[in-house]
Amino acid sequence: MMETLCKRLSACQDAILELYERDSIHLSDHIDHWKHVRLENVLLHKAREMGLQSVNQQAVPSLAVSRSKGHNAIELQLALESLNESSYNTEEWTLQQTSWEQWVTDPKQCFKKGGKTVEVRYDCDKDNTMQYVVWTFVYYWLEGKWYKVSSHVDYNGIYYETQDNEKVYYTQFDRDAKRYGVKGIWDVCMGGKVICFAPVFSPCEVSTPEIVRPLHTSNSSNAQDAGVPTRKRHRQCDPDEGPLDFVHNLQPTTDSSTQCTLHNVAPIVHLKGDKNSLKCLRYRMHKGYSHLFNNVTTTWHWTNNTNSKCGVITFMFSSTSQQKQFLQCAKIPPTISVSSGYMSI
């Protein structure tokens, strides 16, 4: 039995060596390669079970090692067989592109082609850099089908867009910024272009951002449906004003002699734009400037909004003076639109 095992292992390894030397660009050959790798580890696993320390002057790995490598070979063989049944089977595929090492490189369990280097300078320091790979093409599996998409880079990280226009980040720079930097900022350099850190806030001398349109809200249920927090606030008002039927009729006054308490009104600011940009903007505001607002929503959108990429976040303030300070001190990116007003709560 030992002699048979030795012969089969030798024949299997010869076939693997031949496939390496062939340097094929066809999926069928790479599938054959992983079949032989799988068989090789089955034979080595059996040899270890038989108590053998070496076969054909080759050290026999532990049971755990041969089992793990065998499972890896099965995983890649099945992935390549399904890829071979797709429309991408006529493309050229190299041994490296179908290797286990590249299969588990981010984005994991995807095939990748055309790697390019992007450099990130943490703390915007050219002596504190890291290099990452941006793949020209990413092949991902979803619901029984392979899709081919491109990778992109922005300030947040490296991502690809799915067929549903969803961004899937497989590298996020803020995570490494905590490890390699102290300021929480970085520059992204690629192809002669630099994406720099754009501060959320500047000194209060900065002019107020352009107001796109005033916000008029007369029904508290609309705001609640949108996920806006409902907390009572106090503000100044004219005691001669009538019932609060329409919030946009409220005109705050600074006359201390005419103070009254309204329990159902709060100043707010809507920021509207790309969902991922809003998420990063909210994160940076929470991190260092939470004193300039009282509360903030998650990203939300109106139910009749057909633009799936566009979202809104709403900031709530305890007073009109805090709202004014926010608008004066906030440096909102030009891609984000601003709406301010009041909301009944």
UniProtKB/Swiss-Prot annotation:
Belongs to the papillomaviridae E2 protein family. It is found in: Host nucleus. Residues 1-202 are annotated as: Transactivation domain. There is a cross-link at K272 (Glycyl lysine isopeptide (Lys-Gly) (interchain with G-Cter in SUMO)). GO terms for biological process: DNA replication; DNA-templated transcription; regulation of DNA replication; viral DNA genome replication. Binds DNA as homodimer. Interacts with protein E1; this interaction greatly increases E1 DNA-binding activity. Interacts with protein L1; this interaction enhances E2-dependent replication and transcription activation. Interacts with protein L2; this interaction inhibits E2 transcriptional activity but not DNA replication function E2. Interacts with protein E7; this interaction inhibits E7 oncogenic activity. Interacts with host TAF1; this interaction modulates E2-dependent transcriptional regulation. Interacts with host BRD4; this interaction mediates E2 transcriptional activation function. This is Regulatory protein E2. Plays a role in the initiation of viral DNA replication. A dimer of E2 interacts with a dimer of E1 in order to improve specificity of E1 DNA binding activity. Once the complex recognizes and binds DNA at specific sites, the E2 dimer is removed from DNA. E2 also regulates viral transcription through binding to the E2RE response element (5'-ACCNNNNNNGGT-3') present in multiple copies in the regulatory regions of the viral genome. Activates or represses transcription depending on E2RE's position with regards to proximal promoter elements including the TATA-box. It holds the Pfam family PPV_E2_N. InterPro entries: E2/EBNA1_C_sf, Nucleotide-bd_a/b_plait_sf, Papillomavirus_E2_C, PPV_E2_N, Reg_prot_E2, Regulatory_protein_E2_N, Regulatory_protein_E2_N_1, Regulatory_protein_E2_N_2. GO terms for molecular function: DNA binding; DNA-binding transcription factor activity; nucleotide binding. GO terms for cellular component: host cell nucleus. Gene3D superfamilies: 3.30.70.330, E2 (early) protein, N terminal domain, subdomain 1, Papillomavirus E2 early protein domain. Residues 215-237 are annotated as: Disordered. Keywords: Activator, DNA replication, DNA-binding, Early protein, Host nucleus, Isopeptide bond, Phosphoprotein, Repressor, Transcription, Transcription regulation, Ubl conjugation. Phosphorylated.
